[in-house]
């Protein structure tokens, strides 16, 4: 029922929307993707590209569309599974709670997704799949490297439009971008090995 989403706070629209984009992209690039999940993932990506920012800005028709897109993305990943973006988001959420804030799941996905795409694209199969996503989004580029660069730029631009930081360093206690985030760099680096080990053990990895 899309009416349930009409009164969502703007920040929640942004975070859940980028969570859905991550669901769809990870499902499409998953090693368990198949003929049944690919169309769901790609159509969800296209709808999110078209409607998320408008939904964030208060367009209720686009909010309705996003409700459907998020369901499609969920259907895709429920059958194709997810990836390391979600694994890291799961393990960093409360990792710095003693510093007074939580890294919200959707914001974590949005921050990590461009970085994971850049890393995963070292694998030729993943690179081809990311290139196909960029083609479906009509981002341009004549080689997979160009397409992936454009995809990463697009996602970072979407984060900017949704007021989501690019990294933990700039993640404010209210989840908005700030020059100096609530997690000190030395604390982040100290806890990183444990976070990485926990992410490897996550069901999404």
Segment roles from a protein language model:
Residues 14-18, 41, 126, 148, ...:
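Generic alpha-helical segment signature
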Residues 1-33, 128-132:
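A glycine/threonine-rich phosphate-anchoring loop and its flanking beta-alpha core
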Residues 24, 28, 51, 55, ...:
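A short secondary-structure junction motif
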Residues 134-205:
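C-terminal charged capping/lid subdomain of soluble metabolic enzymes
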Residues 27-154:
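Active-site segments that bind and position negatively charged phosphate/pyrophosphate groups
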């Amino acid at each position: 029922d899309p009416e349930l989403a009409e009164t969502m706070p703007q920040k929640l629209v942004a975070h859940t929307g980028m969570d859905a984009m991550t669901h769809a992209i990870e499902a499409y690039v998953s090693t368990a993707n198949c003929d049944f999940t690919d169309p769901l993932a790609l159509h969800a990506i296209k709808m999110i590209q078209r409607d998320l920012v408008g939904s964030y800005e208060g367009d209720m028709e686009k909010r309705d569309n996003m409700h459907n897109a998020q369901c499609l993305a969920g259907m895709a990943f429920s059958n194709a599974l997810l990836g390391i973006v979600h694994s890291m988001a799961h393990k960093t959420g409360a990792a710095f709670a003693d510093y007074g804030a939580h890294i919200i799941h959707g914001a974590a996905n949005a921050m990590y997704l461009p970085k994971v795409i850049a890393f995963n694209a070292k694998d030729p199969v993943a690179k081809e799949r990311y290139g196909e996503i960029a083609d479906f989004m009509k981002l341009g580029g004549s080689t997979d490297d160009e397409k992936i660069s454009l995809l990463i730029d697009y996602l970072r631009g979407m984060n900017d439009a949704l007021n989501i930081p690019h990294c933990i360093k700039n993640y404010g206690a209210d989840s908005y971008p700030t020059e100096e985030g609530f997690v000190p760099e030395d604390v982040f680096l100290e806890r990183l090995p444990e976070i990485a080990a926990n992410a490897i053990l996550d069901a999404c990895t």
